[in-house]
């Protein structure tokens, strides 16, 4: 299952992933505080998420529920990045990430464990 969510839609999803089922009114209040969105803007973005199948709506109270997990979106976004920027090569992405920063001994050990798990 692949979803392309825009930054605005990810703001709505982030609330649902953190809070669980949440009313549209509460989402609008949170996003007004966080980024200054009006209620109308928030409801428009929620509608787009519903249309994409990322959010489910139940009544009464216009309760929103995430229908896709953060992990699914992370995987889809990562795969798109790999395809678009690294010619479909995961190892090129990893090399770019590792080449841009010095790793601590702990981070290196963690990466070794991850590689062993993938074998």
Question: Each predicted region: which residue ranges?
Answer:
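Short helix-to-turn junction characteristic of helix-turn-helix DNA-binding domains
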Residues: 16-20
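Short, cationic-aromatic polyanion-contact patches
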Residues: 3-8, 60-79
């Amino acid at each position: 299952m692949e979803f392309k969510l825009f930054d605005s839609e990810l703001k709505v999803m982030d609330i649902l992933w953190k809070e669980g089922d949440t009313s549209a009114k509460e989402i609008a209040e949170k996003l007004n505080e966080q980024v200054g969105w009006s209620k109308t803007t928030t409801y428009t973005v929620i509608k787009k998420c519903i249309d994409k199948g990322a959010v489910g709506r139940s009544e009464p109270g216009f309760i929103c529920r995430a229908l896709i997990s953060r992990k699914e979106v992370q995987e889809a976004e990562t795969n798109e990045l790999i395809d678009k920027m690294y010619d479909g090569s995961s190892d090129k992405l990893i090399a770019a990430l590792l080449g841009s920063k010095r790793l601590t001994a702990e981070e290196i050990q963690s990466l070794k464990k991850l590689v062993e798990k993938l074998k």
